[in-house]
A protein has these predicted regions:
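Hydrophobic transmembrane alpha-helices and immediately adjacent juxtamembrane helices
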Residues: 1-261
Length: 261
């Protein structure tokens, strides 16, 4: 019964906490909009030269551009956003481990609130601007919208689960910046943020579409465009990464106990 109230409260807390940084979010929305316009013109030129590249037409490509720009904040595609490394270094993680919920579930609930806030404040403006300037396609019915909503939620969970593992690494590495940098490169390149993974050739394309990063952007955008669903793929990677995160949490707890925390 406690969990029924606890986790919705934590989601609301995560939303409100990030709402205090409204100007930062609006600045991010402005930046995403500007880069979205620049990317759109590049993609228009590319698709005019190579029509139907990767199974997309020009409108699909421009829609891909602005919807992926809207995903940057909610999916936290440049990494971070959890605050766990700082708490591990300060020792405050010991307090987190005695809360009435697991560290992983607690942090996930807060992150869902963060994602919801950034979707509204940082995600909608570039999408609306793209629709106004270029004209974007959209899901063709309530069923497709519902599938996209579910896929988007699963993408946020996969993103969280990956970033959670990166954050836990500081318990053994002391400084997670190297891992975080590698993670940012992988998320940017293999999620589908830079370019649709459908245009990657041969074995590189097969590899990119099989990695968890594809579940963060490429699968949701394909659902949005009606190019497929991929929900089972997202569920699989969410389950795998969350299981690894749960195992990592147990190792962190053991390490804190051994060190007298």
């Amino acid at each position: 019964v406690t969990a029924i109230y606890l986790y919705p409260t934590l989601i609301l807390y995560g939303f409100r906490k990030h709402a205090t940084y409204v100007w930062a979010a609006l600045a991010g929305a402005f930046t995403n909009s500007v880069f979205g316009i620049l990317r759109a013109y590049v993609l228009i030129a590319l698709w005019q030269a190579r029509p139907h590249l990767g199974g997309y037409d020009v409108v699909d490509a421009v829609t891909f551009c602005f919807v992926t720009q809207a995903m940057i904040g909610p999916m936290q595609l440049f990494g971070g956003g959890l605050g766990i490394p700082e708490r591990i270094r300060s020792g405050d993680i010991a307090l987190d481990l005695v809360r009435p919920a697991s560290l992983q579930a607690w942090t996930l609930a807060e992150d869902l609130g963060r994602a919801a806030y950034l979707l509204v404040v940082r995600g909608l403006p570039p999408t609306l601007l793209g629709a106004l300037l270029f004209g974007l396609t959209h899901p063709d019915g309530p069923d497709r919208w519902a599938l996209f909503g579910l896929s988007f939620l699963l993408g946020v969970v996969v993103s969280f689960a990956w970033r959670y593992l990166v954050a836990l690494s500081v318990c053994w590495l002391i400084d997670e910046r190297g891992v975080a940098t590698v993670s940012m490169i992988l998320m940017t390149f293999f999620s589908g943020l830079a370019l649709p993974l459908t245009i990657f050739p041969g074995w590189l394309g097969e590899l990119a579409r099989s990695l968890p990063f594809a579940a963060m952007v490429q699968v949701p955008i394909d659902v949005y465009l009606g190019k497929g669903d991929g929900l089972a793929f997202q569920v699989l990677w969410a389950a795998v990464l969350l299981a690894l995160g749960a195992a990592g949490t147990r190792l962190v707890r053991h390490k804190v106990v051994i060190q007298g925390g």
